[in-house]
Amino acid sequence: VTALVCAPLFSMAHAQDARPAAAPPAAAQDKTLTVFAAASMKNALDEANAAFTAKSDVKVTSSYAASSALAKQLEQGAPADIFISADTDWMDYSSGKKTISDATRVNLLGNKIVLIAPKDSKLADVKIGQGFDLAKLAGDGKIATGDVKAVPVGKYAKAALEKLGAWQAAEPKFAMAESVRAALALVSRGEAALGIVYETDAKVDPGVKIIGAFPADSHPAIIYPVAATATAKTDATGYLAFLRSAAAK
């Protein structure tokens, strides 16, 4: 008897479970975007995100790190709607892994690499060109930049120094950081005598000063591509359009 009574109850419970869940009201719909962005984008992007939210009521949360780390996180399934890389290589990598929407990819902006020193350093107005002796300039100190094997700023730095004939002598003095902001911090704290970072980062840290600029033709062009991810929400389209607009400049 027990079996005969329980069977219908079991069936009814599953029938109830199978009913589609009611759609949330429009006000409860998810109005957020997650942006994975190169560390060097932080200051400018924080401002742009605030402006976009004020305009659209879509809240934007950004995660800043080295482009290499972000691309790997996307590959591992980390949730994000937008990816902004500090070089084309890691965006190409993400394209190959099918983690971005190629149709949405555009080049957003550019940058420069500069030589920096702590603000109280006596070094100034360093001419950077062929035969530039970076190793001698650093003395007994370290030279900070991003990991030259993975972090875009480090890759640009190595390319420039190789072209200028300064890499071989300077290589042993390098302190490789996980991101451009980490390299910047080493110089700002006085833990490195010199650093090679993006101009935009150097300008926002009062603890450092720019003492030289690398010739544009000494390294590949510094381009920041942006794209929606393969799993992006629909609001990502409006965000991308905003980043390219005059309002975000």
Predicted regions and their residues:
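Bacterial N-terminal signal peptides
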Residues: 1-11
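Exported/periplasmic ABC-transporter solute-binding proteins
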Residues: 16-78, 85-88, 92-249
